[in-house]
Structures are given as structure tokens and as C-alpha cells.
Swiss-Prot record:
Record keyword ATP-binding present: no
InterPro entries with a match to the protein in the record: HAPR1, HAPSTR1-like
Protein known as: HUWE1-associated protein modifying stress responses 2
UniProt similarity note: Belongs to the HAPSTR1 family.
Polar residues bias: start-end ranges: 170-181, 208-218, 254-267
Pro residues bias locations: 149-165
GO CC aspect terms: nucleus
Pfam families (UniProt xref): TAPR1-like (PF15251)
Highest taxon, organism lineage: Eukaryota
Primary location: nucleus
Length: 273
């Protein structure tokens, strides 16, 4: 099952591999085979290192025999026999055993490093062939180190303030519209007050007028007052309320109001009085 799965993944990966990538993978697969001089050692390693073990075992037997003969000759020393020959034989046997053991260990170590390096390359290539066109740095480091990649960080919350509910927005718009209506009422209140003041001033001038000049001024004031009343009659209280409810009143600045009041005939008549 595993072999069939690997073959299927390799077939899928072949579709998105470029020509250069396929060539590199083929060369890497060829390099997995050991050189001829190392193939023999690898074969011996896989077979249990029979030749190395046999050679080391033979040297160990020679060393053990030489050391035992040395102790035997030293215990029952005979006249005319020298102890130099047994000692020399034992020393040479132990030295040969030590040297051959060191060489065998170094050869095995080098062979193991090379085999491990090639196995690591093979594992990485097999991991890349799983259909991944982009490999994250965390995944590669965790794979090479043999650890589990860390969990992704939680998503960041947006820094923008949340939008207010729809009801709150409509209430704010209604408050702004009501405040604008209140502001728009001020010019009309001033106009109504000036209209009432002009009527009162006209009555006073009519009662207190003795000279013909005053009567002429009063008559002219009456004409102007009637003219203003005719102008203001269409804007009575009912129509003003309808205009305010419909929201058709436009804002006027204080400068425009003051200009209109200054240029009005009521202001001119008051100056004459």
C-alpha cells in the first residue's frame, strides 16, 4: 500500500516538475549509489561485517594467546630462557589488534556518515515530491530537525473602531436635523419681532404727530408699514409651520440677516423717527 501511494504521489509531482528539476532529481537518484570502493564496505556492513569481525576476532585470539604465554613464562621461568621474546610477541599482537580496531571504527564511521547523508537527501526529495510547489521555512526546519512545526499565530484583530448600530446612527441624524431646524428659526423670530416693533412705532408716531412734517412722516410710515404687512402676509404662522415641517428652510448667516435688516425700509423709517 505504501509503495503504491508513493508511486501515485510521484506521478502527480511529475506534472509540475520542470525539465531542469527532473534532471536534478535523476542525478540525485544516481548519486545514491555508493562508489565502487565503498560498495564493498557497504556490502560488508550490510552482511554483518563478516570480514571485519573475523579479522578482528583473529587478532584478538593472537593477542590473548601472546599475553597468556607471557604470564605463563614469567611464572615458571627456566634457566637459559629469555623473557624478551614472549613479551615482544604479546606487545606486537596487542598493538596490531588496537590499530586494526581503530581503522575498522573509522571506516565504519565514514560509511555511516555518507549513508546517513544520502538517506537524508533521499528523505527530503521524497518529501518535496508530495506535490508542494512552495515550502515554508518553518516546515523545512521542523522536518530537518525532526520536530513538530509550531502552531500558527492567532489572527490579528482590526484596529478600526466597530461601526455603531443602525438605530444609533438614525438617532444622531435626527438630532442633527432638529438642531439645524432650531438654528433656522432664529432669523424668522427676529423678523417677526421687528415686524411687531415697526407696528408699535407706527402707532406711536400717529398719536404724537402735531406738525405737518410729522404727519407726512407718519403717513409715509403707514404706507411702508402696510407695504411690509402686504409682504409678510403670505408668511403667516400656519405657512411658517408648514415650511418648518417640510424642512425646506435654508440656513442664513448672521451677516446676511444683519445686511437684510440694515437695508430694510423698517430700519430706514426708524432712523427717520
Amino acid at each position: 500500500m505504501e509503495e503504491q501511494q508513493k508511486e501515485g504521489e510521484a506521478e502527480v509531482a511529475e506534472h509540475w516538475f520542470s525539465k531542469w528539476e527532473r534532471q536534478c532529481l535523476a542525478e540525485a537518484e544516481q548519486e545514491e549509489q555508493l562508489p565502487p570502493e565503498l560498495q564493498e564496505e557497504a556490502a560488508a556492513e550490510l552482511a554483518g561485517l563478516k570480514s571485519e569481525k573475523q579479522k578482528l576476532w583473529h587478532l584478538f585470539q593472537i593477542s590473548a594467546t601472546a599475553v597468556a604465554q607471557l604470564y605463563k613464562d614469567s611464572g615458571c621461568q627456566q634457566q637459559g630462557l629469555s623473557m624478551w621474546d614472549p613479551f615482544q610477541n604479546a606487545a606486537m599482537a596487542v598493538t596490531s589488534l588496537y590499530k586494526e580496531s581503530g581503522d575498522a571504527h573509522q571506516r565504519s564511521f565514514d560509511l555511516g556518515v555518507q549513508v546517513g547523508h544520502q538517506r537524508r537527501i533521499k528523505d527530503v526529495l521524497e518529501w518535496v515530491k508530495k506535490g508542494r510547489s512552495t515550502i515554508r521555512r518553518e516546515d523545512l526546519i521542523s522536518f530537518l530537525c525532526g520536530k513538530v512545526p509550531p502552531a500558527p499565530p492567532p489572527p490579528r484583530t482590526p484596529r478600526t473602531p466597530p461601526k455603531p448600530p443602525t438605530g444609533v446612527t438614525s438617532q444622531a441624524v435626527a438630532t442633527e436635523s432638529s438642531s439645524s431646524v432650531d438654528v433656522d428659526l432664529q432669523p424668522f423670530q427676529e423678523a417677526i419681532a421687528l415686524h411687531g416693533l415697526s407696528g408699535a412705532m407706527a402707532g406711536i408716531s400717529m398719536r404724537s404727530g402735531d406738525s405737518p412734517q410729522d404727519s407726512g412722516v407718519a403717513s409715509s410710515g403707514r404706507r411702508k408699514t402696510s407695504f411690509l404687512e402686504d409682504d409678510l402676509n403670505p408668511f403667516d404662522s400656519e405657512e411658517l409651520a408648514l415650511h418648518l415641517d417640510s424642512g425646506g428652510i435654508r440656513k442664513r448667516t448672521s451677516a446676511q440677516c444683519s445686511d437684510g435688516i440694515t437695508d430694510s425700509p423698517i430700519q430706514k423709517r426708524n432712523r427717520m423717527v
